[in-house]
Amino acid sequence: RQLTDDFYATSVNQHETSLDFKVNEWPDEEFTIPMVGEYNVNNALAAIAVGKQLHITPAHIKKALKNVELTENRAEWVNGAQGERILSDVYNSNPTAAKQVLKTIEELPTTGKRIAVLGDMLELGDASARLHASLAANIDPKKIEEVYLVGTEMENLQDALEKQGY
């Protein structure tokens, strides 16, 4: 059977450190992944679709997804010295991932301030300045109160944020 876009997630619920969702193919099953960012549901759906094609049961797929080992510093929660909760997504970042993480930060509930610390994204070639500056459109000062930038390429984002009055 050929997979189509008829395979999709429903009832997506984001928590502080995980996501729960259902899949239309198995509406009574709830899947959990130990990471934030609704974009990660699409990654999980790819794994679920492959599992389904290989006739792996939903129970086994659920267990594997719930226990997946994350790459260090990719959507990883870190505890700060004074009790801060830091979402670290600094390993080999790229514009698409950075935009998704900024969206996730804006959507996560918090009792404190949201602070973004962004460093240079490497290996972007001639498009580097434009791609760094493009992140400004994904930073809402009403939702992310402070932004700290590290690296020479991030000067492009700084210029773009200043033009927006940030």
Question: Residues of each region from the PLM?
Answer:
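Phosphate- and divalent-cation-binding pockets in alpha/beta enzyme and binding domains
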Residues: H60, N156-L157
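Short acidic, glycine/proline-enriched helix-loop-strand junctions
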Residues: L157-Y166
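Nucleotide phosphate-binding/pyrophosphate-handling subdomain across enzymes
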Residues: H15-T17, E25-I144
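Short, polar loop motifs at secondary-structure junctions
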Residues: R1-Q2, G151-E155
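A short beta-strand/loop micro-motif in the catalytic core of glycosyltransferases
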Residues: E146-L149
